[in-house]
Amino acid sequence: MKRQIILSAMLLAAAGALACTNFIVGKKASKDGSVICSYSADSYGMFQDLAHFPAAHHQKGEMRQIYDWDTNKYLGEIAEAEETYNVIGNINEWQVTIGETTFGGREEMVDTTGIIDYGSLIYIALQRSKTAREAINIMTSLVE
């Protein structure tokens, strides 16, 4: 077992550190059946504060301004949900958790007209979903 841990650590250390880090343990892998998820935006100087979005009720017709997660550049507006849930980091009050390990992409694939970047998509989905399936549906509807 020690040999496997050491080998895994060496392989991880040798890999380029340009993507974010997720640590996920399923209920069958933990000693007490707990599910453990952690996320860190730790690539190339992306260290950030712990995000907090308190639960809220919004007026019908209220708009939400979208700013790029990486650059804070204004991208546009979308309709705000009438109710949003409490989010701390990458988990909401319903225990929905979203992580990511993006690594750039091809420049010719960038949609310059898009108004929702991946970071905003994560936080919007967490603020609006009670289940993982609901989060997927919300994210899909926002990018279609």
Segment roles from a protein language model:
Residues 7:
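Anion-recognition interface
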Residues 20-118, 138-142:
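A contiguous strand-loop segment
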Residues 14-15:
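N-terminal signal peptide c-region/cleavage motif recognized by signal peptidases
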Residues 18-20, 127-128:
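Generic detector of solvent-exposed, compositionally biased contiguous segments
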Residues 122-144:
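A conserved hydrophobic secondary-structure block that centers on an alpha-helix together
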Residues 1-4:
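Positively charged n-region of N-terminal signal peptides that target proteins for export
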